[in-house]
């Protein structure tokens, strides 16, 4: 089989599992899909309710190093609260492939024509094409997921905190060492006003 598209694999690893959990937690499907801005190069992966969620993923069993792609990504001056959602995946034979996860989401939103259309549009924007579904063979299971609220003590660089003259930054943080209130997705969605 051909190597899986890194863009589509990235969508799976970073965002689709969270999207499914949002809908399972009571966020209306269309609202959850409309908030999913990752495929559209949004500053955060989800802008929902009054705030946002940035999804980070690791396959590592130890530690949780997350790559932050800009000074804007963890800036909560525009949207509050802001959560970093850490998702730990494991590649296992009993896991779910990307096409299986997509099929499950399509089934979940099947009764809403607008939601089906929006899901298809976002998947294409993310680089997932159903015609290539046979190429996505890796199976993953979510072993842990947590939402960490970004507050004053959270380690981050923003335009407001970076030294004068710094206009761009890409950096790593260890989510296991980052201070902040840790909750599950449903609690975070409540705090965001999404459910």
Where are these regions (language model features)?
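Phosphate-interacting basic helix/loop segments used at nucleotide- and nucleic-acid interfaces
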Residues: 13-16, 26-39
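Charge-rich, low-complexity intrinsically disordered segments
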Residues: 168-195
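Conserved catalytic cores of phosphodiester-cleaving nucleases, focusing on short active-site segments
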Residues: 22, 46-59
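Beta-rich nucleic-acid/ligand-interaction surfaces
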Residues: 32-52
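Single conserved hydrophobic/aromatic residue that forms the stacking wall/gate
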Residues: 3-8, 12
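Catalytic cores of nucleic-acid endonucleases
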Residues: 57-120
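C-terminal structured domain segments
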Residues: 117-177
């Amino acid at each position: 089989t051909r190597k899986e598209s890194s863009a589509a694999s990235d969508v799976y690893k970073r965002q689709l599992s969270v999207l499914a959990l949002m809908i399972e937690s009571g966020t209306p499907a269309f609202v959850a899909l409309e908030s999913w801005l990752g495929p559209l190069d949004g500053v955060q992966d989800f802008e929902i309710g009054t705030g946002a969620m940035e999804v980070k993923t690791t396959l590592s069993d130890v530690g949780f190093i997350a790559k932050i792609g800009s000074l804007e990504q963890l800036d909560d001056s525009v949207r509050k609260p802001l959560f970093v959602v850490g998702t730990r995946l494991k590649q296992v034979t009993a896991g779910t492939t990307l096409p299986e996860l997509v099929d499950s989401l399509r089934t979940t939103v099947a009764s809403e024509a607008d939601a089906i259309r929006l899901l298809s549009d976002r998947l294409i924007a993310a680089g997932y094409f159903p015609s290539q579904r046979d190429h996505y063979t890796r199976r993953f299971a979510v072993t842990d997921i947590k939402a960490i609220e970004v507050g004053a003590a959270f380690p981050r660089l923003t335009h407001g905190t970076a030294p004068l003259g710094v206009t761009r930054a890409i950096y790593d943080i260890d989510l296991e060492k980052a201070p902040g209130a840790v909750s599950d997705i449903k609690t975070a969605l409540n705090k965001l006003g999404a459910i």
